[in-house]
Amino acid sequence: MQAHFASEFMLSLAHALESQLRAAIDRAFPEAAASARESGTGLDPQLAPASKPEFGDFQANAALPLAKPLKQPPRQIAAAIVDQLMVDTAFTAICLTPEIAGPGFINLTVRPECLAAEVQARLADARLGVPLVEGDNDGQQPTPVVVDFSSPNIAKEMHVGHLRSTIIGDSLARVLEFRGHPVLRLNHVGDWGTQFGMLITHLKQVAPEALETADAVDLGDLVVFYRQAKQRFDDDEAFQTTSREEVVKLQGGDPISLKAWSLLCDQSRREFQKIYDRLDVRLNERGESFYNAYLESVVEDLNVSGLLVSDDGAQCVFLEGVTGKDGKPLPVIVQKSDGGFNYATTDLAAMRYRFAAPPQGDGARRVIYVTDAGQANHFAGVFQVAQRAGWIPDAGRLQHVPFGLVQGEDGKKLKTRAGDTVRLRELLDEAVERAESDLRRRLQEEGRDEDESFIEQVATTVGLAAVKYADLSQNRITNYQFSFDRMLALQGNTAPYLLYAVVRIAGIARKGGDLDVTTAELQFSETQEWALVRELLKFDAVIAEVEEELLPNRLCTYLFELSQVFNRFYDQVPVLKAEQPSRSCRLALCRLTADTLKLGLSLLGIPTLERM
C-alpha cells in the first residue's frame, strides 16, 4: 500500500510545478524532449526546495544539463522555459513571475495569497494539513502496522537502553497512528528461557509459601533477587542441577513451575508498568512465551520449503551472501542439537504470526523492530530466512530500526559511579529533581510565588520531556551523550526551549490577545511574517518524512527551527500593539504556531504547559 500525500500543501505544489515545468520544457524544446523520452529518461526539471529564502520557494535547474545537447547558453534555455511557463494559467495561479539566477537557475516563488489561504485552511483543520492514509484500492481499511519496541527481560530492571527503544518506538507508533494506520504496539518481553530455571528454583526455596497461596508475591527488589539466584547458580552445583531440571519441568507444563513463573512475570510486569505510566507509553504485552506453541511448526515449515540443513545435529538455515571469517555461509540455528529452540526460532515464529492473515495471525503489512544496533546482524539473518520461507507477503515490509548506545559525558557507556548499569527509574527521578531545583531557583530570581502543585506539575513535565527529547532529537543511529545540564537548558535544541515557545504564546492570550480570532482574509507584509508562514507550512511534509524514514529527529529539528523562527518573529514584529488588520493576522500566526508545536510534541510523546 502506497502512502498518498496528495493533499499536502508544499508536496502537492511541488508535484504540480514539476508537471508544469515538464510541459513547458516540452513546448520550448519539442525535439530534445522527444529524444529524451525515446531514450526512456525524459527531461528532468530538477525541481528542489530553494536553498535560501532569497531564491524563492523552489529552484529548477533543468537548463544546465540541456546546454550541451541544445548547444545554447543555459540562461537562454531558462528564458525559453520561463516564457512557456508564463502562458500556462495553472502555473501563474500558483507562482509569481520566475527569476533566472546565476548560470541559469529558475527561481520560483509561490504567490503570497496561496500561502495565506493555506494558513487560513490550517487554522480550521485539527490535522494541520496532514491527510489520513488511504486504504487499499478496494476500499478496505489500511492494513495494520506492528511496532515491536521496549521488550525488557522479566526479573531484570529496565535500564537506559530500554529507554531508547521505548521512546523511539512510542514516537514512531504515534506518528503512524496519527496518519491513520492501525498500529499494534507490541512488547516482546523476555518471559521464557533457561534463566527461569534458576529463578524458579530460588523462589521455591526462599518463598515456598507463595506457591501455595499467593496471587501475587512481593520479592522486594527483583534485581537483587536475580543476582542472588545467579550467584547460587554459579557457586552451587546442586542448585545448578535443580535449575536445569526446573527448565524441563517448566517446558513440560508442570503446574507448580508455571505458578512460580507467572508470579515472577507478574511482579516484573508491575514494575515495568510504573515506568510506562510515567512515560505515558501504551504497549500490548506479547512475550516470547506466546510463540512457544508455534516453534515446532516453524522448523517443520523450513524443512518442507527445503531450507533446513542439519549441521552437527543442529537444524540451520544457511544465509545467502553472508559468510564468516572462513568464507563459508553463516547459519541461522533454529533448533539446537539437544532439540531446544532459541531466540532466532522465536523471532521467526513472531514474524510468521505477525504477517499471517487473521485469525491465524495479525495480518500486518509492515513490521518495525526498534532495537539497539548491536542486533542488526541477527535481524538481517532472520529477515532473510522469513523472506525465503515465503512468510512475508509481496507488499510486506520488514524493517529494523536500530539505535546507538547511550553514553556518559566521557563518551563511554553510561554507568553509575559504582560502575553499574543505570536504572531507568533512578534516571527519571533525577531528571525531575533537577528540573524542580532549576524551577525553584528561577522562581526565586523572578520573585514569583507558585504553589507546590504547580511546581510538581512543571518539574515532572519538563524533567521527563527533557529526557525524551534529548534522545529523540539525536539521529537514532548514532550513540548519544547523556547530559542533564544540556537537556534541561532553556536555550538550544531542548524540550524546555520548545515548551517555553508554547508558554510564550499562551502568555499572549493571557495579555488579551484572542488567539481564536477569525479574519476574512489573512494579509502579511513583514519578512518575519512570511518566514513564519513558510516554516509552518512545512509540517505535513515533515510528518510524511518521519513516517517513511522512521527518524523522529527530523520532527525535532523541524519543531526547533519553527520555535526559532517564531521567536525571531515575536521579538521583531509587534503583535498585541499592532494596528488592525495586522494584529489579527499576527495572532492567527501565533495560534497556528502553538497548534503546530503542541501537535508535533504530542507525536514525540511530550505534553505541553500553559505556564512555566
UniProtKB/Swiss-Prot annotation:
It catalyses: tRNA(Arg) + L-arginine + ATP = L-arginyl-tRNA(Arg) + AMP + diphosphate. A motif ('HIGH' region) lies at residues 152-162. It is an enzyme of class 6 (ligase). Pfam families: Arg_tRNA_synt_N, DALR_1, tRNA-synt_1d. The keyword Ligase applies. NCBIfam families: argS. Monomer. Belongs to the class-I aminoacyl-tRNA synthetase family. This is Arginine--tRNA ligase. It comes from Prochlorococcus marinus (strain MIT 9313).
